[in-house]
Amino acid sequence: MLCAKNKKDPKPPPASFSETSKVQNVQNTQPKPAAPSQMSIDESHSKNQKLPSAEKSVEECKKPVSPEKKKSPIKVLSEKKLKSKKKEEDKEPDEKVEKDVKKEVKADNNEPLVKNLKIAKKEQEEENPKTDLESHKDEAEAKKKESRRQKKMRNKNSKEGSVEKMEKSEKAY
């Protein structure tokens, strides 16, 4: 009951605010001229700053970009690769040879290090023999690795076999 009392009855608007009178009032009003100080600021601002997009017509902006102008990311990447290849070709042959030699030297430098590392490990094992527990752990890890490798090979072989079976069954039909 309290809610019903609090609600206001919608009253119709007075007759003076009818639809036609609203339209007539809007049409009769004249636009007010801007203040002279405001106009001078706007004019000076527009003279000082001309945006390039403002010079374009709206129609030009709405035109879709032609497919010739659009570049796919793949084309852009391929152009970059071509440019980099041209740069490499433009380099003097001495620079290319130097780079190749440096790469070869790095590979050669690693081989003695690997050999030395293996020799050092063997020497360390001879000097400090492993305890039974450590050797047992190493053997267990080696067995696990071997079993994983065998399992992968079995899976690979079974997949290849299943593919061959599928091909044979397709040929039979």
Curated annotation (Swiss-Prot):
Source organism of this protein record: Caenorhabditis elegans
Region described as Disordered: 1-173
Biased composition (Basic and acidic residues): 1-11, 56-109, 120-144, 157-173
Compositional bias of kind Polar residues: 17-41
Compositional bias (Basic residues): 145-156
Domain of life: Eukaryota
Name by which UniProt lists this protein: Uncharacterized protein T15H9.5
